[in-house]
Amino acid sequence: MLECFKKELELRKDYLDQKSVSTIYFGGGTPSVYKPEQIQMLIDECSKYWNIDTDAEITLEANPDDLNKKYLAQLRNSSVNRLSVGIQSFHDEDLILMNRRHTGKEAYDTIKRAQDYGFDNISVDQIYGVPGLSMEKWIENLDLVYDLDIQHISSYHLMYDPNTVFSKKLEKGQLIEVEEEESFNQFKYLIDSARENGFTHYEISNFCKDGYISKHNSSYWKQKQYLGIGPSAHSYNLKQREWNIAHNYKYMKAVQEGGEFSEKEDLNFFDRFNDLILTSLRTYWGLDLGLVKEQFGDDLYRHCEKKAAKYIQSKHIRKENNALILSDEGVFISNDIMSDFFFIEED
């Protein structure tokens, strides 16, 4: 697989209309199954085709059980300078339900160990809306996160995706989905407590200490180009969306034999506008109305002004420096607001 990654990098070296990169992210599964020297080899491979900024953010997603002492010691000798650790919960019963291999104690100890090895830019994932996760347990989870003195939190509601263990258990009546009000209260507590502990809520699901906004995720939300390598990886060049074959063997075979290993979707004028809505309104920078007018003209500028009026009146949106920004109340209904702002072409 590594040779295929190298081959795809070579094949797609001209995809990005830029000569340097500010962020590299090893994610999309469990990249920590690769040895640190293999991770570094891929970073070096990237440097053949692009200049990597001296202050580039280079992130490795990892499960707690992969980050043992030997792995961390070797990883410190690589260019990786940020860890994103999939903790999910510190309660063992939740971790068993989510089919995780680590325990709550192992997760906590892993973060402490990574800090001991000098990693000072660490993000952790937390899941709320989990069946059986009471508010008391959720508060305990977050208290442990704050106690760890990490720099970044990503937190998501449990999703019942089709054909997953969760969705099958739900269908069989083996799980009871959390009430919407309980999920709302857990999310609200997260927002309030994160602020009290020095975090900025800079995107719907993301919180950071000063100076630790994720460069990588921010690239998506700020409509920057990105290139994804490997099975299921997505790419975007401001004109097209592109996604690779999901099946490992089919991907490897196509890359090795010079076949097609991705699909493309051309974005029309309104697709690009709706993308801007989706990525901008979810952030604390908000939707820049000046940018809307510059890139999409007066009609869509007026469309945004008109849509915003009722949400400004209801205090779900505030207008600052010609940008539309969701309030805390707006964040709770963000999907509805963004859908309302979308421009749908009439047949």
Where are these regions (language model features)?
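A short, conserved structural fragment
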Residues: 312-322
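Short, amphipathic alpha-helical interaction segments positioned at domain boundaries
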Residues: 329-347
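Short, ordered coil/turn segments that flank beta-strands lining enzyme active or ligand-binding pockets
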Residues: 222, 313, 328
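C-terminal scaffold of the Radical SAM
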Residues: 1-14, 19-298, 346
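Minor-groove-contacting beta-hairpin "wing" of winged helix-turn-helix DNA-binding domains
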Residues: 323-327
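Short amphipathic alpha-helical interaction segments
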Residues: 298-312
